[in-house]
Amino acid sequence: MPVSGVGWGGRVSSEAGAAGQAEANGYRAGRLRVDGRRDGGSRGGRPWVLGWGPNRLRSFSPLRVGHLEAAVWVAYYQRQWARFLALSVLVVRTAFGMDWIRTVHGAWLVLRANQLWAPPPPKSDPAGARRCMRRFYALLRLTHGEPADPARAAELEVEWWRVHRIHQRGEDGDTQPLVDALSQLYAYTFGLDESALRPAAEYRARAMDLVDQWVTEGRRMDSPLLPPMRAALVRSYAALLAAVHR
């Protein structure tokens, strides 16, 4: 599915750089003080990161996120945008652990990115989709201190959407370009070697093949293709979680 992508995170190069990048992407940085009040970011501090304890970016439930994203995919291909938004709120909250204000804002940005991408070329707006996803990744950076460059993460996100569209239309029957594009996004997000993320990318590509077949066969809700699609997404997230904790 477009975002979700839910593939995410990079490395923070410096505290001043983090604040500057956040402001460049349209959000003001700051710090959370011990007494719970927020300091301004004018002194070059690290982006304001909520005290979740262990990084929630690396402590999600593969079963929960996989099942939620499968439902998001169904809503996307049925163009049920209200349902897509409601489910995206749950995905963003469950997968990324942002506070509720950022969660709702992030889900809205994901919705708009998908709506801009959904029409077939030349009616689609890849640049607009990238702008929305850049702002989404900037929210993620404010929460978790990563990815290092939201604009780069957004480029990689929308790139795999592009590769999937080509694959979906049968212009390229090989899944390797899609696996490569997903691996690159995951590697950038988590700061790991691509080889460690390929199992997660391969399961995700398998899930996409199944949902594409489901679309071709009429998008029936009782289709036997939906359970294995959900299972492939769960396996993808399980492989991703295993890789980032290896």
Task: Describe the role of every protein-language-model region.
Residues 57, 95-102, 142-145:
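Flexible helix-coil transition and linker loops at the boundaries of alpha-helical arrays
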Residues 89-114:
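Short, charge-rich amphipathic alpha-helical segments embedded
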Residues 36-47:
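Hydrophobic membrane-insertion alpha-helices, especially the h-region
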Residues 133-217:
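Extended amphipathic alpha-helical interaction segments
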Residues 61-69:
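Generic helix N-cap/helix-start motif at coil->alpha-helix transitions
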Residues 220-246:
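A cross-kingdom marker for long, charged
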Residues 76, 117-121:
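Hydrophobic/aromatic side-chain positions at a characteristic register within alpha-helices
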